[in-house]
Swiss-Prot record:
Note: There are at least four genes coding for non-identical gamma crystallins in this multigene family.
Chain segments carrying region Connecting peptide: 42-46
Record lineage: Eukaryota, Metazoa, Chordata, Craniata, Vertebrata
Keywords of this entry: Eye lens protein, Repeat
Protein name: Gamma-crystallin 1
Organism: Rana temporaria (European common frog)
Keyword Manganese belongs to the record: no
A Pfam family annotated for this UniProt entry: Crystall
Length: 133
């Protein structure tokens, strides 16, 4: 599941795997207010994500098919201004090692970071959403 702090899938986002979460702090929530949520569909195929240094798919580009715990070590940039999800579903994290704010990306084009709900272009890590059972 992907939980959202505000209605219409806005505000802080929280990715939850199957399990029990008796307290919002156990899923790294900043508060206990959830106003919208969505199921992340199962994806059994391959994964492909292209990240770009600048908006509108400009600047340096790298393509990934695996999780990346430290974007800066692979991409040499701390900021990602646009991306294209070619296959699979992905979670972007604001800080390295899958920490900080989370952003759910479905297949499609994201021409600027605000389109995935971020307030800054900072991306420290990302991972594939894989089968969770």
């Amino acid at each position: 599941w992907m939980l959202y702090e505000h209605p219409n899938y806005t505000g802080h986002q929280y990715f939850l795997r199957r399990g029990e979460y008796p307290d919002f702090q156990q899923w790294m929530g900043l508060n206990d207010s959830i106003r919208s949520c969505r199921v992340i569909p199962q994806h059994r195929g391959s994964f492909r994500l292209r990240i770009y240094e600048r908006e509108e798919f400009r600047g340096q580009m790298m393509e990934f098919t695996e999780d990346c715990p430290q974007v800066h070590e692979e991409f040499n940039y701390h900021d990602i201004h646009s991306c294209n999800v070619l296959e699979g579903h992905w979670i972007l994290y604001e800080q390295p090692n899958y920490r900080g704010r989370q952003y759910y990306l479905r297949p499609g084009e994201y021409r600027r970071y605000t389109e995935w709900g971020a307030v800054t272009p900072r991306v420290g890590a990302f991972r594939r959403v894989q089968e969770m059972f």
